[in-house]
Amino acid sequence: GPKRAFYEPNQILGMVLDHLKNTRDWKGAAARSVATTHLVDAVAKYHNIELIETAVGFKFIGDLIAHDKIVMGGEESAGMSIRGHVPEKDRIIACLLVAEMVAMQKKPIARILSDLYAKVGTYLTRRLNFKLTEEEKARAIANMKNDPKTVAGYKVSKVIRVDGTKCVLENDAWVLVRFSGTEPVVRFYAEARDEATLKKLCAEGEAFVKGV
């Protein structure tokens, strides 16, 4: 039979946004948190709509939904909502939209995703958690205040501080360092256009966070 696979929220957000734009004549932007895939940006650009980047926390996207500003908004931690729907993260609507998408396109999800990648490009994302001592955490916070020039040998083209420190790199990749408010953990997010670059970014993740 067909290979079964789990699809990440990041991938689902890209596919669902594309599906909504292909099947509804809704006006409005797309929104995602700073920690969420730029696949959403690529789909938004393809459909010629604006992209809004928010801090982490669904309330920011919920607010945009409540004011009818966006077609869809979502986060990599599996929360999304759509225009005219509740301003809360709703996994049920996500599942229903995926079912609708598969039924209307008459293709398995794997094909829908590979077709989307062929259309807008491939985006691969990973999240790592690093446990830090208080001393390491203090040093990491100080390090992040300086704008890093390179990450894993790639030039930083832009630093975004919507929530944590996000470095957008020259090769359409990015990394984000965020401190958990509740535990001595640093979250490190990385995204690249190919597996080799992603591996490189993740291998450097801990050293980059600790500034060693």
Kindly give the residue locations of the regions a language model identified:
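Polar interaction faces of repeat-based domains
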Residues: 8
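Phosphate-binding and adjacent anionic-ligand microenvironments
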Residues: 1-3, 15, 22, 26-212
